[in-house]
Design a protein with these regions (language model features):
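Small-polar-interrupted transmembrane alpha-helices in polytopic inner-membrane proteins
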Residues: 107-110, 140, 164-181, 194-198
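Alpha-helical transmembrane segments of multi-pass membrane proteins
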Residues: 132, 136, 149, 191-202
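Juxtamembrane helix-loop-helix connectors linking adjacent transmembrane helices
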Residues: 35-58, 79-149, 156-161, 291-295
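Membrane-interface helix caps and helix-loop-helix hairpins in membrane proteins
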Residues: 119-126, 179-188
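Membrane-interface helix/loop boundary segments of multi-pass membrane proteins
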Residues: 7, 146-171, 203-210
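N-terminal, membrane-interfacial amphipathic/helix-forming hydrophobic leader that caps
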Residues: 1-82, 226-295
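Transmembrane alpha-helical core residues of multi-pass small-molecule transporters
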Residues: 62, 175-176, 193, 217-222
């Protein structure tokens, strides 16, 4: 399927985009967490950690429910196939490898900038179990996939089909950033950076029409930052990590403060540069001259 054909195919969407946004957020932020909480409330021994394998499933269940809910809604209400949502069956493994390298590389560049500024350094984190690292990779992979199916696979297409690609990317990225508003240490810089992350992922999606690739970038970014480097991922730190990231205290604008380096000036600079490169390719690929859809 050509990119132009994929973009135009979404004009047949049947559901109002505002309804689609409401349902998607309801599934992501309310229904999936509540079902998970209900299940583990009924089985307190699992929540208490008597069964480590099932206890670990608590980290994966909300994302699995979100993926299932969105796919069922998109298929039932909008008659969209997996391919329509960017879940192509071709080169899935290759897409994950390339995306993972890109995601890890981006966060490495952000960290390098902070180290050069003397605002960060690393120390050994003392991980005791390789299984914990692998579990962390799995959790971030499934979470990344669930968020990308929601934001890029479904919502981006819904918004772009009704409001045009440019407006779709902008609104989608604002919602993506706003979804993190209650995270620890959230700031205006963090919002701007997450908005830029959204535009980068959206641009990459329109260039590839491949949710696997975009999900891998998202997952590898979080995994590298949280599990490998031991930094806060959007305000959340992990108990198990390979290294420990130390940032200069008192200069939150440079380091991102308690939100983590995703809210840092270094991250802003890297994202602006990457976004500029990708957006030029999007404009060239789709010959964009207007922010509104050309029907």
């Amino acid at each position: 399927m050509k990119h132009s054909e994929k973009y135009s195919s979404f004009y047949r969407l049947r559901v109002n985009p505002w309804v689609s946004m409401f349902i998607a957020f309801l599934i992501l932020l309310v229904i999936s967490p509540l079902i998970t909480q209900g299940i583990f409330t009924l089985y307190p021994s699992v929540s208490a950690g008597d069964y480590p394998l099932f206890s670990s499933a608590r980290l994966l269940l909300p994302s699995a429910l979100t993926i299932t809910g969105i796919l069922v809604w998109a298929r039932t209400m909008d008659k969209l196939s997996l391919k329509d949502l960017g879940l192509t069956q071709k080169k899935v493994f290759v897409s994950w490898v390339i995306g993972s390298l890109c995601g890890a590389g981006l966060i490495a560049v952000v960290l390098a900038g902070l180290i050069l500024l003397g605002a960060a350094h690393l120390s050994w984190g003392g991980v005791s179990s390789a299984a914990s690292i692998l579990l962390g990779a799995l959790v971030y992979a499934v979470r990344g996939l669930s968020e990308e199916i929601v934001f890029r696979g479904y919502l981006l297409n819904v918004m772009s089909s009704r409001w045009g690609m440019v407006a779709g990317i902008l609104v989608n990225s604002v919602l993506f950033a706003a979804a993190h508003i209650f995270n620890v240490g959230f700031s205006i810089v963090a919002f701007i950076n997450l908005f830029l992350v959204g535009t980068v992922l959206a641009s990459l999606y329109w260039l590839s029409a491949n949710v696997w690739l975009v999900s891998a970038v998202h997952a590898a970014w979080n995994f590298t930052l949280g599990i490998i480097l031991g930094g806060a991922v959007s305000g959340t730190t992990q108990p198990v990590h390979l290294l420990t990231l130390h940032t200069e205290q008192g200069n939150w604008l440079i380091t991102g403060g308690s939100f983590g380096i995703e809210g840092s000036l270094s991250c802003f600079i890297v994202l602006v540069a990457v976004r500029a490169v990708l957006w030029r390719r999007v404009v060239h690929r789709y010959s964009i001259t207007s922010p509104f859809p050309q029907r």
